[in-house]
Swiss-Prot record:
The keyword Cytoplasm is assigned to this record: no
PROSITE patterns associated with the record: ATPASE_ALPHA_BETA
Keyword ATP-binding: yes
Record's subunit section: F-type ATPases have 2 components, CF(1) - the catalytic core - and CF(0) - the membrane proton channel. CF(1) has five subunits: alpha(3), beta(3), gamma(1), delta(1), epsilon(1). CF(0) has three main subunits: a(1), b(2) and c(9-12). The alpha and beta chains form an alternating ring which encloses part of the gamma chain. CF(1) is attached to CF(0) by a central stalk formed by the gamma and epsilon chains, while a peripheral stalk is formed by the delta and b chains.
Task of the protein: Produces ATP from ADP in the presence of a proton gradient across the membrane. The alpha chain is a regulatory subunit.
Protein name, entry field: ATP synthase subunit alpha
Stated family: Belongs to the ATPase alpha/beta chains family.
A molecular function (GO) term: proton-transporting ATP synthase activity, rotational mechanism
InterPro entries reported in the protein's UniProt record: ATP_synth_asu-like_sf (IPR023366), ATP_synth_asu_C (IPR000793), ATP_synth_asu_C_sf (IPR038376), ATP_synth_F1_a_nt-bd_dom (IPR033732), ATP_synth_F1_asu (IPR005294), ATPase_a/bsu_AS (IPR020003), ATPase_F1/V1/A1_a/bsu_N (IPR004100), ATPase_F1/V1/A1_a/bsu_N_sf (IPR036121)
Organism: Pseudomonas putida (strain ATCC 700007 / DSM 6899 / JCM 31910 / BCRC 17059 / LMG 24140 / F1)
Site entry (Required for activity), positions: 374
Catalytic activity: ATP + H2O + 4 H(+)(in) = ADP + phosphate + 5 H(+)(out)
Highest taxon, organism lineage: Bacteria
Length: 514
C-alpha cells in the first residue's frame, strides 16, 4: 500500500484552490442571529451603510447602527415581537426619511412622521433625510432679528434671536415646558412656524399641550412630534432629528421657524440605552463616548442662512430672503446640578442658557429665571430697540437686589441709598412675575419696563405691583391705542414715544384706579 505524503496533499489542495474560479459578490441579504430588547444582530450583510434602513419580513424596519467585522447591530423602529432568529434581513439602500412640508402644520405625528391625531392621512408631502449636515460657515448670516417669547424677563434680559440656540435648563416641574409653549403661542401672528418635539413625555401631558395650543389658535402654525415615554428608545433617539428636518424645510425656503426639544436629557438617556444594548463601551455616567456629538450635530442645524443659500437651495425660486431655524432645547437637571455630563455638554454647544431655579419658583417668582446665571451670547444684537433701551438697568437692579437682600438680613440700620436699591429691586422682581399662557406684546412689555426704569413704581406698594401693571396696560390700550400700535409695529424709542409714555403714566397714576 502506497503511503500518502502530507506535503503532496497540501500542494494538491492549494492547486485546486488557485484554479477555482469564484467571483466575489457582495451580499445585500443577511440572516437574523439574535433579537432582544429592540436590538437585532444580523450576519451576512456585506454592503450596508451606517444609518441605512434594513427591511425584515412583515414590513418591519430597522436602522443599522453598529457595523462590525462579522455582524451588523440594528435598532428596530417600532414593534419587534414578530421577529425571530433565522429570518432574512435585506438592505434597502436608503437612509431614514420623514415627511416635510406645510401640510404637517396643525398635525401631531410620531418620530417617523406618521399622523397620530386621528385627523386622517397627511396631504401630498415630500420626504427628507432625518440626518443632514448643518450649513457651513460661508452660508450663514449673523443673528440680528428677534424672536419675541412674550416673557418680560427673557425678552428684556436674555433676548433670543432668529437662528440662535438658547437652552432652557432647570429641575423638574419648574416651568421649562411652560416657557417654551408660551414662546410658541406668542408666534401665532409673527410669521414664525413652530415645531414642538416631545421626547419621553407622558401622553396625557402631550395631549394637554396640544389642547392648549388649539385653544390659543397656535396649533395651526405648529407641528407636534411625539416620542412618548411608552415608545422605544430608538424612536425617542430619532424624534429630535425628525423634528429638526421638518423645521429645516421652512429655513431652507427663506422662512423662519422655531423648534423646541422637550427634552434632550431624555434623548441622551434613550441613546445611552441603545448604546449599552449594542455593547458599546460606556464612559462618564455610563453615557457612550459620542453623546456630545449626539447633541452637537442636532443643534448645529439650527442657524440663520443667507440669501445666497436660500436662492441656491430653491434653484432661484426664492430670492432676497434669509431663512432661520431657532432652537430652544430643554435640559432637566437633578437637584440644580448644572455641572453634570449632559447639561455641561449642551451649555457649551448652545448660544446661551435660561436657568430656572427651584428656590425662586417655590418662593412664588414665576417664571423662575435666575438673571445672574442666565445669559444670551448673541441675542443682544437682535433685541427690539425699545426693549433694549429700557431694559438696561433691569438686570443690574435684580443682581444688586439679590446681593443686598442677603446682606440686609444681618444689618439692622441701612443707609438711604441701600434702602432705595432694595425697594427698587423688590418692585422689579415683582414686575418680572408673569402668568402662564399670557405672553405680552412688545408695547405692553415696553410700558412695564418704562414704568420701572423711570421710577414710576417707587410709590406703589409691592403687593399691588401686579394689579398696577394690569390696570396700566388696560388704560394705555384703551386711551392710547395709537401709541401702543406704533410701538408694536416699529419697536423704536424716540423723544415722542418717551413723552407719550411719560404723560400717559402720570395721567393714569392721578386716577388711583389700581
Amino acid at each position: 500500500m502506497q503511503q500518502l505524503n502530507p506535503s503532496e496533499i497540501s500542494e494538491i489542495i492549494k492547486g485546486r484552490i488557485d484554479n477555482l474560479d469564484v467571483s466575489s459578490q457582495a451580499r445585500n441579504e443577511g440572516t437574523v442571529v439574535s433579537v432582544s430588547d429592540g436590538i437585532v444582530r444580523i450576519h451576512g450583510l456585506a454592503d450596508v451603510m451606517y444609518g441605512e434602513m434594513i427591511e425584515f419580513p412583515g414590513g418591519v424596519y430597522g436602522m443599522a447602527l453598529n457595523l462590525e467585522q462579522d455582524s451588523v447591530g440594528a435598532v428596530i423602529l417600532g414593534a419587534y415581537d414578530t421577529l425571530a432568529e433565522g429570518m432574512s434581513a435585506k438592505c434597502t439602500g436608503r437612509i431614514l426619511e420623514v415627511p416635510v412640508g406645510k401640510e404637517l402644520l396643525g398635525r401631531v405625528v410620531d418620530a417617523l412622521g406618521n399622523p397620530i391625531d386621528g385627523k386622517g392621512p397627511l396631504g401630498n408631502t415630500q420626504t427628507d433625510a432625518v440626518e443632514k449636515v448643518a450649513p457651513g460657515v460661508i452660508w450663514r448670516k449673523s443673528v440680528d432679528q428677534p424672536v419675541q417669547t412674550g416673557y418680560k424677563s427673557v425678552d428684556a434680559m436674555i433676548p433670543v434671536g432668529r437662528g440662535q440656540r438658547e437652552l432652557i435648563i432647570g429641575d423638574r416641574q419648574i416651568g421649562k415646558t411652560a416657557m417654551a409653549i408660551d414662546a410658541i403661542i406668542n408666534q401665532k401672528n409673527s410669521g414664525i412656524f413652530c415645531v414642538y418635539v416631545a421626547v419621553g413625555q407622558k401622553r396625557s401631558t402631550v395631549a394637554n399641550i396640544v389642547r392648549k395650543l388649539e385653544e390659543t389658535g397656535a396649533l395651526a402654525n405648529t407641528i407636534v412630534v411625539v416620542a412618548s415615554a411608552s415608545e422605544s428608545a430608538a424612536l425617542q433617539f430619532l424624534a429630535p432629528y425628525a423634528g429638526c428636518t421638518m423645521g429645516e424645510f421652512f429655513r431652507d425656503r427663506g422662512e423662519d421657524a422655531l423648534i423646541v426639544y422637550d427634552d434632550l436629557s431624555k434623548q441622551a438617556v434613550a441613546y445611552r440605552q441603545i448604546s449599552l444594548l449594542l455593547r458599546r463601551p460606556p464612559g462618564r455616567e455610563a453615557y457612550p463616548g459620542d453623546v456630545f456629538y449626539l447633541h452637537s450635530r442636532l443643534l448645529e442645524r439650527a442657524s440663520r442662512v443667507s440669501e445666497e443659500y436660500v436662492e441656491k437651495f430653491t434653484n432661484g425660486a426664492v430670492t432676497g430672503k434669509t431663512g432661520s431655524l431657532t432652537a430652544l432645547p430643554i435640559i432637566e437637571t437633578q437637584a440644580g446640578d448644572v455641572s453634570a455630563f449632559v447639561p455641561t455638554n449642551v451649555i457649551s454647544i448652545t448660544d446661551g442658557q435660561i436657568f430656572l431655579e427651584s428656590a425662586m419658583f417655590n418662593s412664588g417668582i414665576r417664571p423662575a429665571v435666575n438673571a445672574g446665571v442666565s445669559v444670551s451670547r448673541v441675542g443682544g444684537a437682535a433685541q427690539t430697540k425699545i426693549i433694549k433701551k429700557l431694559s438696561g438697568g433691569i438686570r443690574t437692579a435684580l443682581a444688586q437686589y439679590r446681593e443686598l437682600a442677603a446682606f440686609a438680613q444681618f444689618a439692622s440700620d441701612l443707609d438711604e441709598a441701600t434702602r432705595k436699591q432694595l425697594e427698587h429691586g423688590q418692585r422689579v422682581t415683582e414686575l418680572m412675575k408673569q402668568k402662564q399662557y399670557a405672553p405680552m406684546s412688545i408695547a405692553d412689555m415696553a410700558l412695564s419696563l418704562y414704568a420701572a426704569e423711570r421710577g414710576f413704581l417707587i410709590d406703589v406698594e409691592v403687593s399691588k405691583i401686579g394689579s398696577f401693571e394690569q390696570a396700566l396696560i388696560a388704560f394705555f390700550n384703551r386711551d392710547h391705542a395709537e401709541l401702543m400700535a406704533k410701538i408694536n409695529v416699529k419697536g423704536d424709542f424716540n423723544d415722542e414715544i418717551d413723552a407719550g409714555l411719560k404723560a400717559g403714566i402720570e395721567k393714569f397714576k392721578a386716577t388711583q384706579t389700581w
